UniProtKB/Swiss-Prot annotation:
Source species of the chain: Debaryomyces hansenii (strain ATCC 36239 / CBS 767 / BCRC 21394 / JCM 1990 / NBRC 0083 / IGC 2968) (Yeast)
Sequence positions that bind Mg(2+) 2: D121
Protein name: Inorganic pyrophosphatase
Keyword Cytoplasm assigned: yes
Binding locations of diphosphate: R79
C-alpha cells in the first residue's frame, strides 16, 4: 500500500495544505489509511504532521473534507512552537495514528479526564527526520499520558521499523537502555513547551511515568474502537469532524467524488518565517 503527499501552496502560509494520496487518489489520513500495516497488528501506519526540529504547528484538519494537513492558527495568525532550551522546535517526528480518536465524550478511568477530540498523537524516535505527510510504518514501544489543559492527550512512543535500532527496541525499557535520556527529555519538552506562550506547565498522569508497550496497545485499541463508532455515526456528538472518506464504502460518508474536489498539486517554496520563531526560551526549573 503506497501513500504519497500532495502539497498545495507554500509552507508557512494560511493556504498551505498537504493531502495524502493512495496510488494518486486523495484519501483521508484520519479515516482511509488503515491503522495497522500488517495482519499481525505489530506494525502500524503513522502520519507525520511535524518533522523533528521544525516549529510550524501542523496538524490533520478535523473540519475540512478529506482532512488535509494544515498549519494551526490562533486569532488568524499561524502558530509556531517555541524553542525551549536546549530543544529546537519539536523534539521528535510528531504525528498521528489513522483510524483513532480520543473521544471527548468519555472520561478515562485512570487519567480522570476526557479525550482531546483528536487522532492519537505519536512520537517517532528514530534517527531519520521525516517530512510532512509521510506515512511511516512503526512499532509501538510505550505511552505517556499528558494532561493538556484538562484533557487526556496520550503520546504514543514508536520507532520506524526501518530504523537501525528497531530490532533492539521492543518495549519501553529498551528505550532507556539504547537511547539514555530520551524519555526524560521528552517528558520535559511536553511539560514546558507551552510556557513561552504564557500558558501553565503541562501535567502528566502516572507521575510522568512512560507506560509500557502492553498499556500503549490497550490505549490504541480503545481509541480505534472510539473511531469505529465515530465513522459509523454511533457517537453522541461527532464534534463537527468531517467524516468524508474515499475507501470505506460501507459508511454513510463514503464519497469517491470527494477526491475530485481536491486541487492539483502546486508545490511552492516556503514563505519566510518571522525571525522571532528562532528565539531560544530559557525556562526556570526545566531540567
Amino acid at each position: 500500500m503506497s501513500f504519497t503527499a500532495r502539497q498545495i501552496g507554500a509552507p508557512n502560509t494560511l493556504d498551505y495544505r498537504v493531502f495524502i494520496e493512495q496510488n494518486g487518489k486523495p484519501v483521508s489520513p484520519f479515516h482511509d489509511i488503515p491503522l495497522y500495516a500488517n495482519e499481525e497488528k505489530t506494525v502500524l501506519n503513522m502520519i507525520v504532521e511535524v518533522p523533528r526540529w521544525t516549529n510550524a504547528k501542523l496538524e490533520i484538519s478535523k473540519e475540512e473534507k478529506l482532512n488535509p494537513i494544515l498549519q494551526d492558527t490562533k486569532k488568524g495568525k499561524l502558530r509556531f512552537v517555541r524553542n525551549c532550551f536546549p530543544h529546537h522546535g519539536y523534539i521528535h517526528n510528531y504525528g498521528a495514528f489513522p483510524q483513532t480518536w480520543e473521544d471527548p465524550n468519555q472520561v478515562h478511568p485512570e487519567t480522570k479526564a476526557k479525550g482531546d477530540n483528536d487522532p492519537l498523537d505519536v512520537c517517532e524516535i528514530g534517527e531519520q527526520v521525516g517530512y510532512v505527510g509521510q506515512v511511516k510504518q512503526v512499532k509501538v514501544l510505550g505511552v505517556m499520558a499528558l494532561l493538556d489543559e484538562g484533557e487526556t492527550d496520550w503520546k504514543i512512543i514508536v520507532i520506524d521499523v526501518n530504523d537501525p535500532l528497531a530490532s533492539k527496541l521492543n518495549d519501553i525499557e529498551d528505550v532507556e537502555t539504547h537511547l539514555p535520556g530520551l524519555l526524560r527529555a521528552t517528558n520535559e519538552w511536553f511539560r514546558i513547551y507551552k510556557i513561552p506562550d504564557g500558558k501553565p506547565e503541562n501535567q502528566f498522569a502516572f507521575s510522568g511515568e512512560c507506560k509500557n508497550k502492553k498499556y500503549a496497545e490497550e490505549i490504541i485499541n480503545e481509541c480505534s474502537e472510539a473511531w469505529e463508532k465515530l465513522i459509523k455515526g454511533e457517537t453522541a456528538d461527532s464534534k463537527g469532524i468531517s467524516l468524508d472518506n474515499t475507501t470505506l464504502s460501507s459508511t454513510q460518508t463514503f464519497s469517491e467524488a470527494a477526491a475530485s474536489g481536491v486541487p492539483p498539486a502546486s508545490v511552492q517554496p516556503a514563505a519566510p518565517i518571522d525571525k522571532s520563531v528562532d528565539k531560544w526560551f530559557f525556562i526556570s526549573g526545566a531540567h
